[in-house]
Amino acid sequence: MNPFTPSDELMDLYDFSATDANNHGDLRVYAYYYWNMYLNWSPFEYVAFPEYGYKGGRSLSYAAHGIRTAELYLNRAEVYVRKFMETGEGNFRTLALADLNKLRENRYDTRTTAYEEVDIKDADELWQFYQEERRRELSFEGHRWFDLRRYGMPELSHVYFVKTGEAETITTLREGDPRYVLPIPQVALDRNPYLEQNKR
């Protein structure tokens, strides 16, 4: 059993309620994560067990996912947001929001409360919202690293720990860090002596 613990930063991106029985808000928290108070970490920790069907199916292979319709909506929305940022044309903003709202309206608890559409006017705010929505939707599916590369390889720090009581390890990728580049597989280097390994 190999659980992953989502960061507080990620969980804070979801608009959900664990106490309001009439409106749970963003249902992805319930569909994607397992709420476990029995793990040897802090109480009531959200965890993801990909191999047991939480977040992404019952695959024993992490990040072994096909393309989902949600990803296609997000990919197209990203193009529209970037075009809106580049040109300032409101039509691209409208198209981006249409894709984002189409995705989101199917992720919220609408039994007693109608989904409220997002309407963001500022290009930079829309870009930020888009990135957060992609992170909410595609968490633990193997997209994040590639997304960060596409966003310009920003500086990133993560805290790692094995269990309570042990020292934490902080790993940092600097902006534009060479570790954002995958190494060329050894089999490819063996077959072509003219290839040079990526610097890491």
Regions found by a protein language model. Give the residues of each.
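Active-site-proximal, Lys/Arg-enriched surface segment
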Residues: 14
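Acidic/polar-rich alpha-helix caps and helix-coil junctions
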Residues: 1, 6, 18-200
